[in-house]
Amino acid sequence: PFGMINAFLLINSQGCILIDTGLPNSEKKIETVLKKLNLTFTDIKLIIITHAHIDHAGNAAKIKFLSGAQVIAHNGDLPYYTGEKKMHFCSTGWFGRVFSKVGVIQKPYDKFEPDILLTSKDRFDLKRYGIDGEVMSTPGHTQGSISVVIDNDKAIVGDLISSGILLGGIVRTHKAKRPPFEENPLQVSQELQSIANKGVKTFFMGHGGPLPQKEVLRHIEKLKHLVTD
């Protein structure tokens, strides 16, 4: 809604990789973008889910069915994907506290079983899909959060970081902030630092952005102070 939720396509001659699937029933929006690029759902060769929140994983089962693509996710969030556990939310401020009571985010979505499960500090090379990049475990927002590093200078980090007001993506999109929910800010700071240490210059996220490395480093320092204060 209002451009606050981002999903990403990595495209080459072999097809494309979809990173996150949006809310349930948003497949028409994805189809519209695919058509503009002269692509169809069957051109999607892999679906990467950065974490289990409904605005990222809510349409995964439908897109998996429409595309026939494999889904990669992390074992840390598996009970939420399969519906074994109800999602819990650790609010970072007033908006998170209010938003967590809204029906949409609490609504269960269609269950699915990821085809490829990362565990611990696993990495998944995307070369087999013609992409110079890797999927890596980056816990903190949720225990099962993952990120994608591309060409060693770009990263798609889900909700490890956000920008803009409310959910993100509206006004002040150049300023980093904590997302409405975050389980472990210390882990988030460590994972963002690890990604920056790889030489990543541009960070793309689920809400707002993109952000340059300099702004992400500033946010990391704020998180460190938050933890120690």
PLM regions and their residue ranges:
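Binuclear metal-ion centers of metallo-dependent hydrolases, dominated by the metallo-beta-lactamase
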Residues: 211-229
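Metallo-beta-lactamase
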Residues: 24-25, 116, 123, 132-139, ...
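Conserved beta-strand hairpin/beta-sheet module of binuclear metal-dependent hydrolase folds
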Residues: 1-37, 148-163
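Active-site HxH/HxHxD metal-binding segment of metal-dependent hydrolases
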Residues: 35-116, 122-123
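Residue-level marker for buried hydrophobic side chains located in beta-strands
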Residues: 17-19, 48, 71, 154-156, ...
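Soluble, non-transmembrane catalytic domains of enzymes that act on hydrophobic metabolites at membranes
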Residues: 43-49, 54-65, 126, 130, ...
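Short N-terminal helix/helix-N-cap motif within the alpha/beta-hydrolase-1
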Residues: 27-28, 52, 57-59, 143, ...
